[in-house]
Amino acid sequence: EGILYTHVQLEDCDEIIEQTILKGEVVERLLYELDGVRYPKHSDIPFYHRQHRIVLENCGTTDAEDIDEYLAKDGYAAFEKALFEMTGEAICKEIMDSGLRGRGGGGFPAGWKWDSVRKQPKGKKYVVCNGDEGDPGAFMDRSIMEGNPHSIIEGMLIAAIAAGSDEGYIYVRAEYPLAVNRLKTAIAKAEEMNLLGDRILGTEFSFRLHVNRGAGAFVCGEGSALTASIEGNRGMPRVKPPRTVEHGLWAQPTVLNNVETFSAVPLIIRKGAPWFKSIGTEKSPGTKAFALTGNVVNTGLIEVPMGATLREIIFDIGGGIKDGKKFKAVQIGGPSGGCLTEEHLDMPLDFDSLKKLGAMIGSGGLVVMDEDTCMVEVARFFMNFTQNESCGKCVPCREGTRRMLEILTRIVNNEGSLEDLDLLEELSATISETALCGLGQSACKPVQSTLKYFRDEYLAHVVDKHCPHCNGRKKVLQIDPVLCKGCGKCMKQCPMEAITGQIRMPHVIDTEKCIKCGACWGCCPFGAIREE
């Protein structure tokens, strides 16, 4: 029936069996309730009702370790169609016709990548899945790897047929142990059913798939750094061209896409390019998964059609700003993205629209901020993250981000000057134009966007020497170890993963990571969070 019960206790089980399973009646008191309304089904809840889940559809509804459940939902049907009914050229054309663009960053056309590798001279070729999700507070790829690993494998199999590859790698950060185990289990089950390995399903096609664990460096999300890491080298980007499609893993042509991109492929092959094109916008078809966090009522993973507006996401799905406060900004795209304002709430959310504003979808992080947030502090936080994650290979990123962080810290502490603002703009332009890889080239977007849309807050720090939103941030948020019961609620709400601690033990806030958004303050039931 699809009925959803919440906060079920052991003593509720007898009533559920008697009323729902035997009599078909709903136990009203166990239903999810919002604003006085009870919702019988998961799909009826406003947070889910307004979404369009295709990639995340099976996450949480099927057993990720049971291949039979995946097969029961048309799993590997697209692979069989590609294997027995389509050529590599036809597969590439179908993906290009669908308009599928990479979901891991800049939105590069996936079909073009595949076709470029297909056209390379015959020889060893690789298919690589980028599961190195490094943005703070982003868990889209992790959710798919843990909840629907076979969709990734099927997508990679189809890519292998298209490109003419017989070997692939899934690169996952070691901080995702469950994802690693689920992927390895899924690969083993697929091998048992001859869906992976040699002479698959009695054909001449063979494909071996490996899981490679990364150390968690943010820069390894960049293609050439990722392939270097798989090879056993230090994860550092290289100069391009040549591109990965020509000179990738072990200097061979390589198809490299992220988890969400590969997961969409089986749906496109099975349902057709026109179906996928019917969702989203003309130039950005399909859906996109986002991690909605920050000062918003409903947080979590969402999936919406491309072209959905920020207003729909934040206010319809997210339920609006916490405690009735005013919306101020949303940071989109993680450390490589920009901050947008209230005037952008009705703008279609797609690759091209965001690029015009100096922002990017990136992996899909969405951090919502209310009227009490200091945007200079936000810019400083993301610059601190980027500077720490810089591989150090190129001078613009290594030294430029360090100097920018010093300037931002000076400004936040009310010790900056007007000349510092000019220097920030000059450094931002130089780094964006001269850095070696995408990490460095986009590292300044949070600073550039906040300078553009929230310049008055910079002026408050450097001219007035007083910020109405943070008072210079001399004070920091701390957790009282006596009052803290270790319930973990603040850890779940923190968009920056700045809170650590064991259950039933006092938690601790990392002041370097904390952006003082107040999410933990508002959710603590014990009043243990204070400002010092």
Predicted regions, residues:
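Ferredoxin-type iron-sulfur electron-transfer modules in oxidoreductases and energy-metabolism complexes
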Residues: 1-29, 78-95, 123-127, 131, ...
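Conserved phosphate/anionic-ligand binding catalytic regions in large, soluble enzymes, centered on
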Residues: 95-117, 159, 216-228, 234, ...
